[in-house]
UniProtKB/Swiss-Prot annotation:
Molecular functions per Gene Ontology: argininosuccinate synthase activity; ATP binding
GO biological process, one term: L-arginine biosynthetic process
GO cellular component terms attached to this protein's record: cytoplasm
Residues where L-citrulline binds: Y88, S93, N124, R128, S177, S186, E263, Y275
HAMAP family listed in its UniProt record: Arg_succ_synth_type1
Family under the similarity heading: Belongs to the argininosuccinate synthase family. Type 1 subfamily.
Pathway: Amino-acid biosynthesis; L-arginine biosynthesis; L-arginine from L-ornithine and carbamoyl phosphate: step 2/3
Residues engaged in binding L-aspartate: T120, N124, D125
Protein name per the record: Argininosuccinate synthase
UniProt keyword annotations, A-Z: Amino-acid biosynthesis, Arginine biosynthesis, ATP-binding, Cytoplasm, Ligase, Nucleotide-binding
PROSITE patterns assigned to the protein according to its UniProt record, in alphabetical order: ARGININOSUCCIN_SYN_1, ARGININOSUCCIN_SYN_2
Amino acid sequence: MIKYNKVVLAYSGGLDTSIIIPWLKENYGCEVIAVCGNVGQKDELDGLEEKAIKTGASKLYIEDLTQEFVDDYIFPTIQAGAIYEGKYLLGTSFARPIIGKRLVEIAKAEGADAICHGCTGKGNDQVRFEMAVKAFAPEMPIIAPWRIWDIKSREDEIDYAEAKNVPLKINRETNYSKDKNIWHLSHEGLDLEFPENEPQYDKILELCKTLEAAPNEATYITLSFENGIAIALNGKKMNSVELLDELNKIGGENAIGITDMVENRLVGMKSRGVYETPGGTILYKAHKDLEELCLDKETAHYKEQIALKFADLVYNGQWFTPLREALTEFVNKTQETVTGEIKLKLYKGNIVNAGMTSPYSLYSEEYATFGEDGVYDQKDSAGFINLYGLPTVVKAKMQEKIKKEEM
């Protein structure tokens, strides 16, 4: 096995990365520098430094990336309208590139020989982390223990942790695999691995109330957007992190953003997860509805195609690629007129548009009215339909001619 003097580890304090510290020291005899990217996981950071040092790390960096994460990764993805397979709001996907980028920066500053992550060889995150590392340090060796060690399951991990006296907050019965940041909380594993099982929402959910426990009265909110970015809630301007935090509270209280889905992983298999994305779900709905008011037909329809590709790029770990950057430039152009206010009604998991306005609205009451109007001459429709239907008419006549010749 190759020897390294100093390894930088992507560290969360969870089961995987907690046991990797003693494993690295045992197998490589190296110094381990743990790096935790704070992307809004909040209480999960409590006691993290003490745990990392106690487990064998020489130091722990806790890098506050939350503001950059929201401004440079989350909001551009909302503007793009990117949703993976129609359901997944990419909560884990776009958190990995920013953490990977910071890992490289610290590894270079520390003079590290390698970067290590705790991603399973069956998952998407191994690709996302390593794509980020390759984008900024293509020569940097990457250690992925799940691809080389003898540990084969989470039960094996717990056994190893107990043998190495690694403190754990989980037990064998409640060992859901989770990922949390300011955008979402995901749950995988245990009973969720069987699609026939209904999720035990009353036991799983942490950010959101269940539908049954949500208030029996609707909650109304108003969001203000400027160039496709939410800038105010109920008339109060906020920075992006404050706004998302507040929407998470409001959305969670109303059971907004609970998704149970089976998705197609990049590595080829299907997996099932339950996602809580309360604030994000509200933002996507508000932004999409405002675009309906502000974008012309051709731009809106073409942008839907861009959204699909953008989602694939983010999901597949291709954030730092020329194509993703080019698509973002296109999206930015489309957002120049996505400015206005939208009122939303939140009720037991539902989000209903309760009215919106924009100085760039392309909706004209004069043209759209079903009543009497003086701006639209309905007689013009006849000529339009004749030209629009010309290919259909020509084809029909051709088919009629062939039938006659065959008789």
